[in-house]
Amino acid sequence: MAEEHVVYIGKKPVMNYVLAVITQFNEGAKEVSIRARGRAISRAVDVAEIVRNRFLPEVRVKEIKIGTEELPTADGRTANTSTIEIILEKP
């Protein structure tokens, strides 16, 4: 999957990300990846569900990947942060 079909979830309102996913599909993408880490994971799940249930019912979840990243902290240690990638597919 090309890197341009990835939506990174942050602190913006959920509907901003929903619009980004819908735009990707409308531009011809067959798959769109939604990626988030930490507290944004629940927002990523919300985005995927809103896209599927409200706007594009033909879209399905192809794959969900979860993992952990080690991020450096301000005091020089490392902190584990959870990650998720939800891949949506349009038939």
Curated annotation (Swiss-Prot):
Keywords: Acetylation, Chromosome, Cytoplasm, DNA-binding. One of its GO terms (cellular component) is chromosome. Acetylated. Acetylation at Lys-11 decreases DNA-binding affinity. Disulfide bonds: none annotated. The modification N6-acetyllysine is found at residue 11. It is found in: Cytoplasm; Chromosome. It holds the Pfam family Alba. InterPro entries: Alba-like_dom_sf, DNA/RNA-bd_Alba, DNA/RNA-bd_Alba-like. Binds double-stranded DNA tightly but without sequence specificity. Incubation with DNA in vitro gives fibrous structures 10.3 +/- 1.1 nm in thickness (naked DNA is 1.83 +/- 0.37 nm). This protein does not significantly compact DNA. Belongs to the histone-like Alba family. This is DNA/RNA-binding protein Alba. It comes from Thermococcus kodakarensis (strain ATCC BAA-918 / JCM 12380 / KOD1) (Pyrococcus kodakaraensis (strain KOD1)).
